[in-house]
């Protein structure tokens, strides 16, 4: 049977990130994607105009309709926005004993708009992350979660260890915000550090890279890949989406999720 993967996240009316990016990734990597939408956003390549939270009952209904019928082999979260939504999502994951949960703790948009309320951080860390298999914060998000500053590679390793010691979950810190010739991600599994390095591509068409990476990892986990292999394959896929990206709109352009489809 084709692997089943669920995204629990928000829409992006501009099509580059959020559930739109997740479903494109699932399709490109040949898994069956389902979606629980938690907020609607009005945004494009240069701004986020408004955010609308969906009622918790409707979020519950989406979970129930998917998991009572189709089921899932893995799940990922993206923008969840509020503590009420985060607590509800965590409760549904527990209720259905969902495995292979990947948390992308989306906090700030590419256009510098807050996508996670300040008072929701505690629920994100202490309720949702603690039931996950992997979290994938970028450097600014890792600073918030670890309550430390990250200025270099060693700081990334230190932050990853602090986070792991708090939540006992695999931590992948994405190094895309670190200004260097290479983009290095750091995985810490509680015992070892693993580095995943990629030459930086000179383009501003990077909208949705975090969503896409976490979706790709989730897809490979659903296919039975081990964590390090899933990350390595996902970074190869991401490199292709960036190298084959295209301009769309006046700001940060989207990735080309379908570059792998011949």
Regions picked out by a protein language model, each given a short descriptive name:
Residues 29-34, 193-194, 220-234:
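Phosphate-handling active-site elements
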Residues 2-7, 27-110, 261:
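Conserved N-terminal subdomain of the carbohydrate kinase-like
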Residues 20-23, 143-144, 203-227:
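Short, small-residue alpha-helix embedded
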Residues 118-193:
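Conserved phosphate/ATP/ADP-binding segment of small-molecule kinases
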Residues 2, 53, 228-262:
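Charged C-terminal helix
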Residues 15-31:
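N-terminal basic/disordered segments at the start of proteins
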Residues 8-14, 193-207:
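Short pre-catalytic strand/loop immediately N-terminal to key active-site residues, enriched for Gly-Thr
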């Amino acid at each position: 049977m084709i692997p089943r993967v669920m995204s629990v996240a928000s829409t992006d009316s501009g099509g580059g990130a959020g559930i739109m990016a997740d479903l494109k990734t699932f399709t490109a990597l040949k898994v069956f994607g389902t979606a629980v939408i938690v907020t609607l956003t009005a945004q494009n390549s240069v701004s986020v105009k408004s955010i609308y939270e969906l009622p918790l009952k409707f979020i519950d209904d989406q979970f129930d309709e998917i998991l009572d019928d189709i089921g899932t082999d893995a799940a990922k979260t993206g923008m969840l926005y509020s503590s009420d939504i985060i607590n509800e999502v965590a409760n549904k994951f527990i209720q259905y004993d969902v495995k292979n949960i990947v948390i992308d703790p989306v906090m700030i948009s590419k256009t510098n708009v807050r996508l996670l309320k300040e008072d929701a951080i505690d629920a994100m860390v202490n309720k949702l992350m603690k039931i996950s298999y992997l979290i994938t914060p970028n450097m600014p998000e890792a600073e918030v979660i670890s309550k430390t500053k990250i200025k270099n590679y060693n700081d990334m390793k230190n932050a990853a260890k602090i986070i792991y010691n708090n939540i006992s979950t695999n931590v992948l810190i994405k190094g895309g915000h670190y200004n260097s010739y290479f983009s290095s991600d750091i995985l810490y599994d509680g015992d070892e550090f693993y580095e995943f390095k990629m030459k930086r591509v000179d383009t501003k068409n990077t909208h949705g890279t975090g969503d896409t990476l976490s979706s790709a990892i989730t897809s490979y986990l659903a296919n039975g890949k081990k964590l390090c292999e899933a990350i390595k394959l996902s970074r190869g896929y991401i490199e292709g989406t960036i190298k084959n990206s295209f301009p769309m709109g006046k700001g940060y352009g989207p990735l080309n999720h379908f570059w792998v489809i011949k």
